[in-house]
Amino acid sequence: MTQINPVTHYAVEDGIAIVTTNYPPVNALSVEVIEGLFHAFDRALGDAAVNAIVLICDGRTFIAGADIKNINNAQARPQVDAFELQNRIETSAKPSVAAIHGTALGGGLEVAMTLGYRVAVPSARFGLPEVKLGLLPGGGGTQRLTRLVGAREALDMMTTGQMIDAAQAHRIGLIDEIV
């Protein structure tokens, strides 16, 4: 396993790149996480020995949203922003899988939606809670969620900020498999 940065690790097993984020307590989408994921995906996409990419997170949860302690901190702007990361993942020619446990909220769900396939444990929960903070999903979540689940379900998730469980996420098409 190779350390991309202090919160992102990279390994290749049997042609599958495994990108792991570990930023306790909730794997918030911090500057370090965004940059680490970008560089790990860049590495996997440039490696001819890699046929697919899996994104997993250590700890108790997947990516639980933006790192709100840095939301207004101009000094905490990443060299690579979340849109560049999402575009890099979404336009990849290699298959990619988000392996979700715990919660995938806000920016974390937006990252998960950029991967081609999403699997989750039965206890996983999903949501776009930005409305509860007086915000709108800002990382492409409004468009991607609508494409995945349809306008009615997407609007409900975005306007209520309520979380849904893995069974409902699977039923509406947000995730592809419960494992």
Predicted regions and their residues:
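Terminal peptide-recognition signature
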Residues: 19, 36-37, 55, 67, ...
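Amphipathic alpha-helical segments at domain termini/boundaries
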Residues: 1-20, 110, 114, 159-179
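Hydrophobic, secondary-structure "cap" segments at the distal end of domains
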Residues: 142-152
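Glycine- (often His-adjacent) and acidic-residue-rich active-site loop
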Residues: 35, 49, 56-88, 104, ...
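Conserved CoA-thioester-binding segment of acyl-CoA-metabolizing enzymes
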Residues: 1-58, 72-73, 87
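Glycine-rich beta-to-alpha active-site loop
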Residues: 59-60, 89-133, 137-138, 162
